[in-house]
């Protein structure tokens, strides 16, 4: 899955539980891929491998269930 598609999907998923779903999605993805946020804008076409996508899905599920960003980020 491309980075831009992953962000769009995550934003949609978080829209019911977050006041800032796009920002949350970007921050969680950056944490998952261990890159700065600017990387998402510079390389939207980069692909996520299956393992990274699974880890991203795990943190999204935590956020969807209402876990605060600060707790997820550690």
Regions picked out by a protein language model, each given a short descriptive name:
Residues 27-74:
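Conserved AdoMet
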Residues 1-20:
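Non-catalytic nucleic-acid substrate-recognition regions in nucleic-acid-modifying enzymes
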